[in-house]
């Protein structure tokens, strides 16, 4: 788990807000991939806090922890802008079976977002793993795509400027198929790992009509869910090849050799191609005989022709 530091132990650095701003720069799905050793709910709450302090309305679909536990550690200024949709206490809606939403929790959440005020909207899903266990993967992917789009339905609020979805995924609980399907929808992927008591976030950002970028940040989460970047650890940003695409060598399946040796090139140049005219035929075509009305047959034996001395046709003058 990420180590929680007190405010007296560390000195805040301005790059911490830069990391959060880069994750919240655009809309779409931001996928947080955590593990048993490196949990991601702390980073999810840090992003929620950042969005709320920027004046955005934040909707949280809580599935794994209670509302009280989720709000713990967030200030009153953040909790006042947080709308919590509780699926933890009654996930199957047994207490009110007559009011169950047949479309599912994501559809109900989408309808709530239509009534939001002007500005950007952040939707936090805690977690996608719980939803994958209760909703078919195809249905969930379709709902995520619709959820992260702006004004895709006639009933949507036209005042909503941007919809951002923060999805927490416990990667170890799922196979490569569901993880790859959800990952293909994400504009930004954050994979949490680390060494000793230091957490690292490997961030893959995909932007339309731009090359993907890859960053690694080392950080700690404070008790108030602010971030502090560690000093002395390298922060790097570089061009990143999408892991879902494989690099193909264009010369691996050629039927010919691109690079010839000197001896091979001389042998190639000495060959006579089958469609080349012999010198006799070239002269006949370039200098036709006047008055000739009959056709002529030109034959120039190849080096591998089998000449039969007893064949009477070989005596013909053609």
Swiss-Prot record:
- Pfam families from the xrefs? Elong_Iki1
Which modifications occur after translation, per UniProt?
A: Tyrosine-phosphorylated.
> Does S-adenosyl-L-methionine show up as a keyword for this record?
no
Chain positions with Phosphoserine modification: 270
Q: Which GO terms describe its cellular component?
A: cytoplasm; cytosol; elongator holoenzyme complex; nucleus
Keyword vocabulary terms for this entry: Cytoplasm, Nucleus, Phosphoprotein, tRNA processing
Biological pathway = tRNA modification; 5-methoxycarbonylmethyl-2-thiouridine-tRNA biosynthesis
Disulfide bond sites: none
The answer to whether keyword Glycoprotein applies is no
A single BP term in Gene Ontology? positive regulation of cell migration
**InterPro entries from the xrefs?**
Elp5 (IPR019519)
Q: Where in the cell is it found?
A: Nucleus; Cytoplasm
- Which top-level group of life is the source organism from? Eukaryota
The record's subunit annotation is: Component of the elongator complex which consists of ELP1, ELP2, ELP3, ELP4, ELP5 and ELP6; in the complex, is required for optimal binding of ELP3 to ELP4.
Concerning its family, UniProt says: Belongs to the ELP5 family.
Role of this protein: Component of the elongator complex which is required for multiple tRNA modifications, including mcm5U (5-methoxycarbonylmethyl uridine), mcm5s2U (5-methoxycarbonylmethyl-2-thiouridine), and ncm5U (5-carbamoylmethyl uridine). The elongator complex catalyzes the formation of carboxymethyluridine in the wobble base at position 34 in tRNAs. Involved in cell migration.
> What's the protein name?
Elongator complex protein 5
Q: Identify the gene encoding this protein.
A: Elp5
